[in-house]
Amino acid sequence: MSLNFLEFEQPIAELEAKIDSLTAVSRQGEKLDINLDEEVQRLREKSLELTRKIFSDLGAWQIAQLARHPRRPYTLDYIQHIFTDFEELAGDRAYADDKAIVGGLARIDGRPVMVIGHQKGRETKEKIRRNFGMPAPEGYRKALRLMEMAERFKLPIITFIDTPGAYPGVGAEERGQSEAIARNLREMSRLSVPVICTVIGEGGSGGALAIGVGDKVNMLQYSTYSVISPEGCASILWKSAEKAPLAAEAMGITAPRLKELELVDTVISEPLGGAHRDYEAISTSLKAQLLIDLAELDHLTSEELVNRRYQRLMQYGYC
């Protein structure tokens, strides 16, 4: 898999390119008895050391870039690695099936659950089909339909958040985008079953919140959660998107900062270099946290779940 190095990772990319070149030469030179294994190993150790150094001191803007990484695992990747027996459910039973939201029945360690999440695309056609992970009202209404189904059958709900925001097109507004988001916020706060939400990439504004009201809210180490994108904030405050790095630092969009503010419960560590470097490792860590959360919430009655969720929402903004 191509790692698609970001701008701040270019020193690592240069080392990796040298490693690839030497490895190719070594393979071709086997017939000539040329052995470059020691040099390749030295460069690999240097690359690892450099990666550790760079990732030990990332700024908010660099983390925002990682949250948007084109190879970052999406909802369907986690469904494939964490769950079994996934059966996708489609449509909002009112207008259409929005491909920017996926969801359905699945099992985690044999336990039935309802899984719902934003889904971006990787290739151009898939990105367009998924609308770049920006749901329309029918996407949020589909999500709510699945949540209400889960409540009827007493199934825990697990959501994965990864969107730049709700789709702002004219058609979406005409079909009631703000109403769909507001309804989800209200209804999720009343659900009588456990709800566990995890930000796996971008957590963009109301588009993220519409499936983000939970008993437990987790964030991956290099994910972000904010009311507006850094570029959008910079355009408003400084009239220039070039100030996005400054805006990202000021907005407090990173997982550690949001945990300090008690807006999220757990920050899940990612593999060195980010989740895109090792799908298996990040899926294992995420699954372990989901199982911990489920076990904790299992001890609560439906009334306790709703009351705790209400108190959680009411204390936002007070630290």
Curated annotation (Swiss-Prot):
SUPFAM superfamilies: ClpP/crotonase. Pfam families: ACCA. Residues 35-296 form the CoA carboxyltransferase C-terminal domain. Keywords: ATP-binding, Cytoplasm, Fatty acid biosynthesis, Fatty acid metabolism, Lipid biosynthesis, Lipid metabolism, Nucleotide-binding, Transferase. One of its GO terms (molecular function) is acetyl-CoA carboxylase activity. The keyword Repressor does not apply. Component of the acetyl coenzyme A carboxylase (ACC) complex. First, biotin carboxylase catalyzes the carboxylation of biotin on its carrier protein (BCCP) and then the CO(2) group is transferred by the carboxyltransferase to acetyl-CoA to form malonyl-CoA. Belongs to the AccA family. This is Acetyl-coenzyme A carboxylase carboxyl transferase subunit alpha. It comes from Photorhabdus laumondii subsp. laumondii (strain DSM 15139 / CIP 105565 / TT01) (Photorhabdus luminescens subsp. laumondii). The lineage of its organism: Bacteria, Pseudomonadati, Pseudomonadota, Gammaproteobacteria, Enterobacterales.
